[in-house]
Curated annotation (Swiss-Prot):
GO terms for molecular function: peptidyl-tRNA hydrolase activity; tRNA binding. SUPFAM superfamilies: Peptidyl-tRNA hydrolase-like. TRNA binds at Y30, Y81, N83, N129. The record marks D108 as: Stabilizes the basic form of H active site to accept a proton. It comes from Bordetella petrii (strain ATCC BAA-461 / DSM 12804 / CCUG 43448). Its EC number is 3.1.1.29. Keywords: Cytoplasm, Hydrolase, RNA-binding, tRNA-binding. The record marks N25 as: Discriminates between blocked and unblocked aminoacyl-tRNA. The active site is at H35 (proton acceptor). The gene is pth. One of its GO terms (biological process) is protein quality control for misfolded or incompletely synthesized proteins. This is Peptidyl-tRNA hydrolase. Hydrolyzes ribosome-free peptidyl-tRNAs (with 1 or more amino acids incorporated), which drop off the ribosome during protein synthesis, or as a result of ribosome stalling. Catalyzes the release of premature peptidyl moieties from peptidyl-tRNA molecules trapped in stalled 50S ribosomal subunits, and thus maintains levels of free tRNAs and 50S ribosomes.
Length: 210
């Protein structure tokens, strides 16, 4: 008796980035504050991708829809304030059936100095309430993060509490360093949209110096 074996080929989900979430707080009072570094980068990426942000209340944020290499790419700036960022990211990921591995979050990072940036996948939230809420909304920590260094008041010699520090604008030299990081991030995001995270990481981290 001959046995017939059937091989089922399951489609492999692309792990290239399809949703970019810039974190920050909405409104003019917060526009220039350190906590809004993710918004700053998201605005530049929308320009690079020739996309325009528009309010989509069902997704709790300003959403921009773009195309890259024939694929759809979404950008979002949540309007729920930092601590509820997961509402927007979770709603978009569910509606468009995106895996956590296809999500890139842009956020400020206290543990990196201005002028430094790191790309990483997974890990904890290190007390960052925006990341904490996104992790809960996605049910996984396996999304990608672009950590934009803003420094810590202690390492920058400032007598400020962290909560106050992140809600103030960077000093001029800090802003210049952050702007340089944003420029470097813009250069490597296309590689992430292509799924080449090794290239993006190598190019991005080489600019951090010793």
């Amino acid at each position: 008796m001959r046995r017939v074996f059937c091989v089922l080929y399951m489609p492999i989900m692309s792990t290239a980035i399809r949703l970019i979430a810039g974190l920050g707080n909405p409104g003019p009072d917060y526009e220039t504050t350190r906590h809004n570094a993710g918004f700053w980068l998201a605005d530049h990426l929308a320009d690079d991708l020739r996309a325009t942000f528009a309010l989509e209340k069902s997704f709790f944020g300003m959403v921009a829809k773009a195309r890259h290499a024939g694929e759809n790419v979404l950008l979002v700036k949540p309007i729920t304030y930092m601590n509820r960022s997961g509402q927007a990211v979770g709603a978009l990921a569910r509606f468009y059936k995106l895996a956590p591995e296809q999500v890139l979050v842009l956020h400020d990072e206290l543990d990196l100095l201005p002028g430094q940036v790191k790309l990483k996948q997974g890990g904890g939230h290190a007390g960052h309430n925006g990341l904490k809420d996104i992790q809960a909304a996605l049910g996984s920590p396996n999304f990608w993060r672009l950590r934009i260094g803003i420094g810590h008041p202690r390492t920058l010699g400032l007598a400020q509490q962290v909560a106050d520090f992140v809600l103030h604008p960077p000093r001029r030299d800090e802003q210049t360093a952050i702007d340089d990081v944003i420029h470097r991030c813009r250069a490597v995001v296309p590689a992430m949209l292509d799924g080449d995270f090794a290239l993006a990481t190598r190019q991005l981290h080489s600019g951090n110096g010793a």
